[in-house]
Amino acid sequence: MSETIDNPTVEEYNEKETVVSGEQVEQVEQVEQENEQVSQSFQISIKTPAEIGTINIQVQPTDTLIDIQSFLYETSETCLYSSFEFRLYGKQIPEYSELSSIEGLVEGATLEMVPVDYNERSAKLHVKRLRDIMNTGLTEFANMNNPSLFTSFSFPEKSNILTEEQQLEEQKQKFEQQQQQQQQTEDKEEKETIATEQQQNKKNKHHNKKGNKKNNGDESLNNENNEEKLTPQQKERKQKMTEIKGIDKPMLSSYYPESPIAPVQCVKSMIYSGWSPVPGYRKLFGDLFYLDITLLEGTTICVTASTQGFFINQSSNATFNPSVSPKATINHSLHQLLTQVSRLFRRGLNQILTNIGRNHPFDMLPGVLPVHNWVASSKTNRYDINKGTDTFVSVQDVELRGNPRDWNEEIQAPKELPKSTVQERIIRDRAISKVNSEFVECAIRGAQVIVDKAILPINPAENQRSHMFLYNNIFFSYALDTRDSFTDCGGDDAARTSANNDLKGIRLYNLADIDGLYTLGTAIVDYKGQRIIAQSLIPGILTTEKTSKIYYGSMDTPTNEEEEQQQKEENEENKNNNTKSIKADPEFHSRLLQAASLLHLSESKVISEDTNQEVSVCTSFESKGIIGIDGRRYILDLIKATPRDPNYTETKDQLSVLRPEAIATYSEYFKVTWLNQKRQQKLKEKEERQKKEGIDPPTATARDEDVQLTEEDLAQSPVVSFNPNLFSKVKLGGTPEEQQKDIEDLKAIGAFLKGILIPRLIEDLMLFNVAPVDGQTLTQVMHVRGINMRYLGYIAKNESANVPFIQDLLFNEMVSRAAKHCFNRLLRSTNASDMAHSISHFLNCFLGTETGSVSADEKSKKAKQIKSSAINELTQGKLWSEIAQLVSSKFDFEIPTHSVPMESRLIVLRCICLKMGIQILAKDYNFTTDAPFSPEDIVDLFPIVKHVNPRSTDGLDLLEAGKTFFNQRKYELATELLGEALAIYHQVHGPIHPDAGACFTHLAMLAYQNEQYDLAIEYQKNALVITEKTAGLDHHETVQAYTTLAVFCQRSGRYNESIGYMKHVLYLTDLLGGEYNPERASIYTAIAAILEDTERFDLALEFLKQTLKHQEFLFTPDHLMCSTTYHKMAIVCARATNFDDSIIHQKKSTDILEKELGEAHPRTKESLEFYTGLSQTANQIKLFKQHQALKAEQDELARLQKEKADQFKKSQPRVSAMPPSLENGSVSELLNYINGKPKKSQSKKSKSTNTTTTTNTTTATTSKSKITMAKTPNPTTKATTSKSSATASSAATNKSTTKTNPTSSSAADSSKPNKKSSKN
């Protein structure tokens, strides 16, 4: 994480916006105006030798041909072409030229890729390029160094929900198609004969019908058509990705998904031939080297790489015949040659390129530095002879065999470039970023070979702890207390801390960016327990000439090994005088004062003990200023670039310094407080003046608005600055009053830290305004607020933070940090052959459970296999005693237990692996055993690197301004600023950078707010892949990116795609989120919403119940969050027509609102109206079901009576004459006639009534029930017209109830004749 000075937001201090926003707006407007002048993109064409032909690309004037070349390398169609040059109108263009400087390169111009001759280096790079691309078909991921799992969880769909603009556009297209068809029909009618016209009209009519049917059905049958187009493998993958069965226990063995792409092989082998190197006489023919390639068909060919290209020669293993074979002609590219002679190679290469093209465009791009994951899939080592020969033929370290790079000159030269305009700053920042990434990459390689003892030190005669190294012109040293400088504050551990503080100081001074003041290129690499410091060399620092002596600061206690030679000379001169000699060169002092004003450091006086005179300095006395033989002024040893922490003033805490974020926040707070006091003072003076004049005092609001501060008042606001030499070993100068004031000022910020910043953090944690889920996010949250990690114990002991989730989080982080120190000490004393045993044994002691299942004989047998005694001496009890002691000394906190809680062990395992660079196998570890880990589970050990991490200041300004306008809902302006920031980041850092990912994230949110869902999804996919590559596959920001993408897909109707992403989010959240992680509730709610949209109501209800369970634990059962969840559960039950449960859930939601907000609150009223509507709907449905049951009973009775009557007819064949009046009579009349009883006379009125009633409707109970139904008012009408809440869920419920209205009304209407007959 890069550490910069973060100012407080407007929300934190309401007065800030009126104080500083004007200056910020002016800066942003200036940057924007300059950026518009230089970033006017234009389109050019590239004529390629590939089958794709000419392609069009959008470029910036500041781009170079190298940038275009990199783009072509990353495009699947042109990635195999490596040796070419660009020509414009037949004229060659230098590859480092900026596009703006190329004459004739304007909008629409065409650059031509022209093949050029090879040399040995370019030909070997071409072969390596082809080999790397072929290897992607055999590896698990396309980019193994920076993998992205996005493609594995992505099943892209088309949006089913169209925005208003898309609907209008679709209607417009349909209208134009109809007009075009009509015009075509009229043209045909004019040319053809009448008979032909009639026949053609029929065809046109039939064709138009089909076309209209097809167009009308496109929207409804879209998903079905897409489903039919899927192959069986795609259908199976889709079902596997989108299937959610419930909340299952996640397994670490399922961390990596199965690759949907089968391995693809192009050739059996491709190695350098034994006929290499080329004989002298063949060099005269242009031969460079020879390759032996075994094709998949089984044949082996020998290929010559020449300056003109590649061709097959006639050599074999026994004979050398370099002449051209008749099998194939010479080709400029190797893949073209192999395509001619091998059909299987052509098929395999096309498949690989197709697979690459299907991946996300950013998938193949490397990051600035690789991010190693802590989990590795089980994979076997593939036999590849090229990997063995790469050590000898690789061109990656060619600089080691030639002149080494002058890193200091490369790092300092870009800082001297002009920076008056945005274009100049972009060029400058890009050069700084590029050389820093190359320096760090080389530093990592150097640190690894040093720890592995593969190179010799430059001082082999001295103690091993004092060894120094030079690798590729980079100076390396161990971060150890080799001269007993830190014996009072921790020894070697303090030396590690001082190296880290020095790097932070370099970052600050680079951020200040003072002309004429330089810092060294620096990187810190932690590898196998050792901390290695890598620095660029100051010219002359290691020579015996006195050309680089100290001009500023103290000369007696150097902490970097670089000054050892010079220090020895200084000590020779003052060997009998053990005093602190402090210098302050005026030129140095004037430049450091500029930096000090930006860093809130005051000019202070210290006593130089050799002269006993006061010296004015504006840095810590330990810092040193050196003038190299190149004439540049370098500032070194910035271990106290910020003042001491006044809350930790003991000698053992002398390296405890304040964070720059805390200083910036306090400075702003102090300024706002002073301005408020100034305003109150003016207000008081005005009231006194009005009182004397007899004017009535205005209201409080009018008074506040009436008092305005002038620019002169703002200019008089005090500037906070601190003495960096307080609580240090140096003797302070100045008067006692000045010293006391400096101490009081410093103690004020200490009180501010403990009294405001930390309580505000605890409050936000309790209210879940911030919800760190692991040590990474907790560290980030605390650092951004200016709180050091040494305050973890102070926060944990605070009664306000006594929440299980927060306590578990703090405990895990403190224990992990203490365990890291124990781990480093163990690794430093471990032999290289025992490294896997050491790591697994430590993890077993740290996270295993001591059950006694391992016998003493087994332990003795394992101990004999290990040479390092430190491993055998380590036990679980001894380790946890050491961890408890470290937690007590570092965090002033006594841990309650000597073990990690079982539910947190996987979380802590991930934490310790990330801190130490350990990579373990993805398998399910049983933490209830003594030894859950074995040496075979340790896959790799990676170096952990910290570096300067330069960032573009212009891009940061535009990004922050875009965020501000986004929060103010000024979306158009925010989109413009964020787009410009993204363009700058692409030019400076490339697309794979955290800041570029932040731009894509905010652009996605802007597109989503503007209902441009497809665009929002594309932006968010870019942000997601960048986050995976820069933060990690399971980082909290990665989980948030997946969640946001799933929400966007849900809103656009891509439900299957959304479920695929949310399924992965659910896995990571349950795997690494802790037992009651607050993020779980929101994740479960989001999944429930998607399941509700896909009408999987039972599963949605299950997730909502889990949400409610977590919320009741984190908050209380009567919390408003629980009320919201109950309401969502009511909606889901209502949509599933389970109205009884829906009413119960909504009643609970309403009760909570009445208790927390009161009956008069609008939310309570809406909830009550919704509850009333649900009750009315449930009653209506209940009555309707009763009526349906009654009707079914009547129909059944009528059917039985009819059957009896039919049977009776069959049994009376002699009855041949029946009066017509009985043919339609009732059953009773029919029985009377059969029995010979006389028929009763009836009036016409009663006859008509009897014929209209149902045959079997005779009981009074039935008539009564029908009368009751007829009198019942229609509750749905009331629910429809009532002013209930306008939520989408209640609307869905109303839809389900209105479907029953026609049936209910018809049932009521059918009861009307019975009502009339009953009256009669």
From Swiss-Prot:
One of its GO terms (cellular component) is cytoplasm. InterPro entries: CLU-central (IPR033646), CLU_dom (IPR025697), CLU_N (IPR028275), CLU_prot (IPR027523), GSKIP_dom (IPR007967), GSKIP_dom_sf (IPR023231), TPR-like_helical_dom_sf (IPR011990), TPR_rpt (IPR019734). The keyword Zinc-finger does not apply. GO terms for molecular function: mRNA binding. The keyword Cytoplasm applies. Residues 379-649 form the Clu domain. Residues 166-241, 552-582, 683-708, 1204-1320 are annotated as: Disordered. Residues 185-194, 226-241, 565-575, 683-695 have a biased composition (Basic and acidic residues). SMART domains: TPR (SM00028). It comes from the Eukaryota. One of its GO terms (biological process) is intracellular distribution of mitochondria. Residues 1248-1311 have a biased composition (Low complexity). It is found in: Cytoplasm. Disruption phenotype: Causes mitochondria to cluster within cells. Keywords: Cytoplasm, Repeat, TPR repeat. Residues 202-213, 1237-1247 have a biased composition (Basic residues). Belongs to the CLU family. PANTHER family: CLUSTERED MITOCHONDRIA PROTEIN HOMOLOG, EUKARYOTIC TRANSLATION INITIATION FACTOR 3 SUBUNIT EIF-3. mRNA-binding protein involved in proper cytoplasmic distribution of mitochondria. This is Clustered mitochondria protein homolog.
